[in-house]
């Protein structure tokens, strides 16, 4: 078994080398010369092994060292073992770095590693996408030269990282940036895209502002009449008008609350529970009678219904979607308009559509029609009792049925609303 070199072994090797020279020198009478030749030979042998070792370390790419004898054998063997250990450690370190980078790439955030001065030495793919960095082209670049925002520069220079920085990019994207010390004189920067969260917060504020605005008008009317009735009793036609107006405003508030509850119920409903068998033809017959009553013969109707076409889904949601589309056509088209309602098979499922030949909708309004409380004609919507929630309800209801609301409109020619229930939700016994 090989062991490390010791003084005893080196002295023993020297004695074994000099012993033959001592015997021969004593025998022939040239002891100093034989000893000198022996030591010189030993030095030449050591220098030759040094050259072999140098060649192996600097030139030869082989993992196995040259064979050694004597005191060189444990030395070369030890170097070989050290090289194997280093190779194993490099492999482990490489695997660790790969796992770190793989984990960093899997993060939903942009990750950038920089020096204390801001020099970039690594970033993940999301950092390239969100922050516009290029790797490896930006390796060594100062991040302050790439993200030129005064608030970001100030954030890094003050070195107060106790709170995140909210940064709005030139693209309109909102970022939440956190910086923390990583290792000695290095920083870890994590940037999270909070654009959607910012939009949701804005939508929430707008929602409450719109609800407050919608309730303020009827409450103001009710308060005005109540104050009037408190000051003096109302009689005759004035009293009837006041009661009629108050009744209209309470019905308007009741309708708004009902639609808000319907929308909230649809949004909270689980999307996977679509196991009710819905008789859409029967539902449409009821909607047809209600539409005729609502229209008061101002519009004409055509209902083209496949009486055998039934679907699986949520009956309340489909009723809300269908009735809202039909009633919207009645409420938002002028007298003399013809409205066509169809429920029929199409190649990819069952299509419901409501089409009219009314004035149509301007293109700039179409993308926003399904927003809550959005109205094309606010004055007319309030006259007809519209809350601005109908199409938002339709959108969420059809989305829960794996469909989407399609809106086609041409100014002066008319509008068509439609959605397609996918084939897999059509009841098996439908003709």
Curated annotation (Swiss-Prot):
GO cellular component: cytosol; plasma membrane
Species this chain originates from: Escherichia coli (strain K12)
Domain of life: Bacteria
Keyword annotations from UniProtKB, A to Z: ATP-binding, Cell inner membrane, Cell membrane, Kinase, Membrane, Nucleotide-binding, Phosphate transport, Phosphoprotein, Transferase, Transmembrane, Transmembrane helix, Transport, Two-component regulatory system
Signal peptide: none
Transmembrane segments: 10-28, 33-51
PROSITE patterns in UniProt: HIS_KIN (PS50109), PAS (PS50112)
Protein name: Phosphate regulon sensor protein PhoR
Gene Ontology biological process: cellular response to phosphate starvation; phosphate ion transport; regulation of DNA-templated transcription; signal transduction
SUPFAM superfamilies with a match to the protein in the record: ATPase domain of HSP90 chaperone/DNA topoisomerase II/histidine kinase, Homodimeric domain of signal transducing histidine kinase, PYP-like sensor domain (PAS domain)
Pfam families: HATPase_c, HisKA, PAS, PhoR
Sequence ranges on the Periplasmic membrane side: 29-32
EC number(s) from the headed UniProt entry: 2.7.13.3
Location of the PAS domain: 96-172
Catalyzed reactions: ATP + protein L-histidine = ADP + protein N-phospho-L-histidine
Gene this protein is translated from: phoR
Modified residue annotations for Phosphohistidine: 213
Function in brief: Member of the two-component regulatory system PhoR/PhoB involved in the phosphate regulon genes expression. PhoR may function as a membrane-associated protein kinase that phosphorylates PhoB in response to environmental signals.
NCBIfam families noted in UniProt: phoR_proteo (TIGR02966), PRK11006.1 (NF008235)
Record localization: Cell inner membrane
